[in-house]
Amino acid sequence: MSPKTETKASVGFKAGVKDYRLTYYTPEYQTKDTDILAAFRVTPQPGVPPEEAGAAVAAESSTGTWTTVWTDGLTSLDRYKGRCYDIEPVPGEESQFIAYVAYPLDLFEEGSVTNLFTSIVGNVFGFKALRALRLEDLRIPPAYSKTFQGPPHGIQVERDKLNKYGRPLLGCTIKPKLGLSAKNYGRAVYECLRGGLDFTKDDENVNSQPFMRWRDRFCFCAEALYKAQAETGEIKGHYLNATAGTCEEMMKRAVFARELGVPIVMHDYLTGGFTANTSLAHYCRDNGLLLHIHRAMHAVIDRQRNHGMHFRVLAKALRMSGGDHIHAGTVVGKLEGEREVTLGFVDLLRDDFIEKDRSRGIYFTQDWVSMPGVLPVASGGIHVWHMPALTEIFGDDSVLQFGGGTLGHPWGNAPGAVANRVALEACVQARNEGRDLAREGNQVIREATKWSPELAAACEVWKEIKFEFDTIDRL
């Protein structure tokens, strides 16, 4: 090559494989306010130093590849590369480390959770030098979060739409989740809403199966909620699941829901995908629909302590992609969820500003600026005896969802709804009077049974039901 045509890439180029840590481990780096920060739990293969493992994560999730390439010289790696800037051992784990990685903002497309995850939790998770890798947390800077619409409406707008304040909202997933005809399904919806619930819900795997096509379900559920509204004088809703095999079909279902005049639709955001979810969230804001989000498939990703991605990351991603509700575990029910960890990501969903707090699994201070909050939904194996704990743990800005705990009532669906509404009102009143629900909760429920035979019957049925298993995902 003549000197006149010599490129920058040819200057100092040396072919071959080099240690990642020579380029991507930078303990002297001072993070910028605009950097996206990640905390990875890294388990290196035997013989791989933690600095090399952390640098490999930074490289493979940003600009690096397995060998030196000519085209490195055609760009500014110092501007675009991810940097492993700190490594700390995990207490009690001999071979695990927390690697902190900083990513320049220019690596990511604006307003795209899909692009963000494709880089940060992409091929690097299959890297052979690592036995396991888990993304524990992300810090999303305001410079990036402001490129997202976020939730279609948020907590305050939802309360204003429903005209319901000062208490958690009550819901119920219709059971059996599969097999009912559309008319029988709508009947169950009506009975639950008439009994005092605010919402009923399609189960996550109810889409448009042969036993109940989506259009029939939408029509019967709309009829049910309008009838219940007329009889109770309260605004009601049913989460109509718009999830479908294509984005076009999903949007068609959302459009039909809007034409029916219902207040809320639903999406399975992990199985449906972030691109579909963000599209639906934009439609919901533009057309006045609330958006309920189910997290089906999350445990495949987040349940193991050493590999995958913690749910707090999925929760942050959902807040950016868009949703007004999201299932967040119960702490006390049948599904996985340790109290402090759960409250950590519940705050990340609801609050504007969340301080770093390692005792709750929050690795970074997060400032959402003006992005609306998301209501956490407690659902899964809960019943009236859990009501005091749920009210105390989740507070007013939440949805408490009882499926079997409503429809399993010995007297029927409407009495099951009455029992839950009475239990909730009793707990809220007791709390407002200054009583300690954590200590006096059972007594509050027993007192309420004296003036609600429906609640008394529910308490008798579920007095021995417990789900006492150790939580897998602990700090």
From Swiss-Prot:
Required cofactor(s): Mg(2+)
Enzyme Commission number(s) of this protein: 4.1.1.39
Cofactor note: Binds 1 Mg(2+) ion per subunit.
Keywords, comma-separated and alphabetical: Acetylation, Calvin cycle, Carbon dioxide fixation, Chloroplast, Disulfide bond, Lyase, Magnesium, Metal-binding, Methylation, Monooxygenase, Oxidoreductase, Photorespiration, Photosynthesis, Plastid
Site (Transition state stabilizer): 334
Modification after translation: The disulfide bond which can form in the large chain dimeric partners within the hexadecamer appears to be associated with oxidative stress and protein turnover.
Active-site residues, as the UniProt record annotates them: 175 (proton acceptor), 294 (proton acceptor)
N-acetylproline carried by residues: 3
GO molecular function: magnesium ion binding; monooxygenase activity; ribulose-bisphosphate carboxylase activity
Predominant localisation class: plastid
Annotated NCBIfam families: PRK04208.1
The family this protein is said to belong to: Belongs to the RuBisCO large chain family. Type I subfamily.
Protein name: Ribulose bisphosphate carboxylase large chain
Organism expressing this protein natively: Cryptomeria japonica
